[in-house]
Amino acid sequence: LIALEKNYFSKLHKANIDAGKKIGWDMWRLESSATPEHTTFVYTHLQPNLDTQSFGFGDTDAYFSKEELAMVQEQWGSMVVDSKFLMTSFKGGFAPIKDQPVNFVQLSYMNVDPTSHYDYEQMELVNFMPGHKNNTLMKGWALHRITTPHAENEPDYLTANFFENMEDIYRNSDGVAQLSKQQKMNYQKILDLREMVNVEVLSLVMAVR
């Protein structure tokens, strides 16, 4: 599967990027799969806006023949057991999306009361993002709102913490700091606003910019 992505599909993603149809494309591997007999990959299409979207490949004749691409797509399909789609919108952060990403990302999925979405976003962006910027272990951070239609008991947001290596993820989880009174108040407030329902760690397989 990785060879097909590298030798064929990544070249088509690059053509879309050069044409201004997308910012970038990443392929990530889930590190803690619930089904160890299978490998879970995450494909990230970075789109400039909702009006300019490109999940297909457009005209592929300049790169591969129709027969060759059909054969490759059939091979790809024979390896995929299941797939799902998730659309998000970027709400803020300091992840350098136009550059090559770092090696690991930790995704945290948040369920937020529907009446508190604005308050939650402000807490993350105003109160917590500055602390993430000062964290020398973290190479980037982003807040995304999940825009794919979903039930109220499913996640509404995800945060992405970017790290150079797994050791830094462990160090970040192990670190304990004494909190000021204001920091304790902010942390308690965000706990009241959201519930963290899942955490995933992904390792970078390849990226196209």
Model feature map: region roles:
Residues 1-209:
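Short S/T/G/P-rich N-terminal loop/turn motif that feeds into the first structured element of a domain
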